[in-house]
Amino acid sequence: MASSASDGTHERSAFRLSPPVLSGAMGPFMHTGLYVAQSWRDYLGQQPDKLPIARPTIALAAQAFRDEIVLLGLKARRPVSNHRVFERISQEVAAGLEFYGNRGWLEKPSGFFAQPPPLTEVAVRKVKDRRRSFYRIFFDSGFTPHPGEPGSQRWLSYTANNREYALLLRHPEPRPWLVCVHGTEMGRAPLDLAVFRAWKLHDELGLNIVMPVLPMHGPRGQGLPKGAVFPGEDVLDDVHGTAQAVWDIRRLLSWIRSQEEESLIGLNGLSLGGYIASLVASLEEGLACAILGVPVADLIELLGRHCGLRHKDPRRHTVKMAEPIGRMISPLSLTPLVPMPGRFIYAGIADRLVHPREQVTRLWEHWGKPEIVWYPGGHTGFFQSRPVRRFVQAALEQSGLLDAPRTQRDRSA
């Protein structure tokens, strides 16, 4: 087992989101260099009782550099707002601390996540491309924030979130189901189908595949005001986005169970989707497995790490103040309900977006140290990683999702 490199202070003061052109262009090079230097220090100084550190290589540095480019793009979509906007965010965070604290949810977060009603009305539409066909499903989310919850009116103004969308690859006979939860900036059919290798899971491994779209992504991101993103700097938007994502997937699970009561169901989440899947797996009983890929453990903490604010910037106080809210919506504050043999995690040792130690390792330990694979790559390197592909298939086999008898299947679903 290996882990990533740097816990150095330079990472906690990441480059600013709106740098001059030169420093912005040089940022990925500079941070990759710092990563490699710290990696060598960690590699040469590792202790036997610590997680092993991968030997730095050119290939690993290239993976880290690619992550830095991705991070630069994410930050361009999420520039830090001025002090006036942060004053409003700070006021909402203070109101949120009072609201959640008065209800005991900061201490017992499970009460924050409302139990959704079963999903009964679903529209299904068949879609054909050049070689295959699949289904798009639609249903009304029905989610609303708690009465009086800070930021609720703004969240409800994002009306594209009212409708949930999902892709469905389904066999004519009953088969196990795998719910694949995408990451940030995904939620588009061609991308999601490719990243999850959905057709292989469906055609070769015989699974029914459902791929829900998270709030403010894909078709649910239409008509948003400028700067509105999930996840982003608006802490209460992150809270509502997390709550609605969990709500929608739990409703989708109820529909799957109504379709095939005896079929096994598993979760397969990636990055932000791994975070959401870990929450669902801590609230829903009866799941056969939860496979968490490069998962976030504490969303607010992660955003604070990458916010780019200097140590003395007063806006950093808002980030610090929001930490209890981040813990409230973190799987680290909940108990996983998936049986231990059904818990799986994979992560990249050179991940520059989701820190292997600060995020992944903490979640792995909280989940009881289930089976984990550390692949030699960055956050985006999982897609080309053969160890990850083998690990996911082995996880599905171990969970029983591939044990059901297989017959000749219709490739067109």
Swiss-Prot record:
UniProt xrefs under InterPro entries: AB_hydrolase_fold
Native organism taxonomy: Bacteria, Bacillati, Actinomycetota, Actinomycetes, Mycobacteriales
Name this protein carries in UniProt: Uncharacterized protein MT2702
Induction comment: A member of the dormancy regulon. Induced in response to reduced oxygen tension (hypoxia) and low levels of nitric oxide (NO).
Superkingdom of origin organism: Bacteria
